[in-house]
């Protein structure tokens, strides 16, 4: 899917902006604070219901505005008639629409418009806590397994119920019932995550040859409980410890994707530049996999490309994105900081004081 029209109202400095993106590279340039990143936030909001910089609405609201609204037209990468999608967020409600109809879940928008995002905090995928890497695996599972989101929601609901039962000192009989249900839902998540990682490995091996500094990268998935036991068994065995702690200490919510470079944790031994190379490779591997699995690539957002990558890695990334066939939105202060060679479809946009115009 691609965007061929984007309209933003009330988001930070963007009071009302309209954009007609091309199907290839869309380069948005301008000085810091002009609204470049806000434009990418709007696209992310349209797909996921939140910004990649914050999940809070208040920082996004333009002065004297009580709502953020993003509407767009999307169409298949193969052509065909575009159709409208949109989202409106206030402090009290969120409304999303596809083809004029309200959607029951924001997951419907996310499935329609898969996004990969690279921004100044993307290094947290390898240097941050385990939650960042669980989210990486969950993204892939969500976009290829129609049941995954339901499993994930059920697991989160059951986990909250079990934690409440632990804090309330509920009898063992009730906890046992939660353990059985939680074990079933959690095992489904675990299987999907482990399977997704295995499908990514061939893509990662191929990309390692193009980025020599990542040749020693190895990934290991740890499920979050004793691999010799079922989840229900581990939950039963951890009841007393969980009662003392007041929360559940085993399960896929404690899973980890270990990233090692030459046998040592990437976060400990890799420079910030090496960490960015690993993140690039992980994101590109997942994008290539999505393309082959679904038949179309994700839309890719790259915020402040020149600040994030040196010239060699900028060239490598842009070549990869050309080959992938993604619609790409890139921000930069200066337009000449982004390589344009090889793009059949590209357009420059200049942002100044929250207004957008086409041109160099």
Swiss-Prot record:
Subcellular location: Cytoplasm
Cross-referenced InterPro entries: DNA-binding_RecF, DNA-binding_RecF_CS, P-loop_NTPase, RecF/RecN/SMC_N, RecF_2
Principal location listed in the UniProt entry: cytoplasm
UniProt keyword terms in alphabetical order: ATP-binding, Cytoplasm, DNA damage, DNA repair, DNA replication, DNA-binding, Nucleotide-binding, SOS response
KW Ion transport (keyword) present: no
Binding site for ATP: 30-37
GO annotation terms (biological process): DNA replication; DNA synthesis involved in DNA repair; double-strand break repair; SOS response
Gene Ontology MF: a single term: single-stranded DNA binding
Biological function: The RecF protein is involved in DNA metabolism; it is required for DNA replication and normal SOS inducibility. RecF binds preferentially to single-stranded, linear DNA. It also seems to bind ATP.
Family: Belongs to the RecF family.
Matching NCBIfam families: recf
Protein's recorded name: DNA replication and repair protein RecF
Organism phylogeny: Bacteria, Pseudomonadati, Pseudomonadota, Gammaproteobacteria, Chromatiales
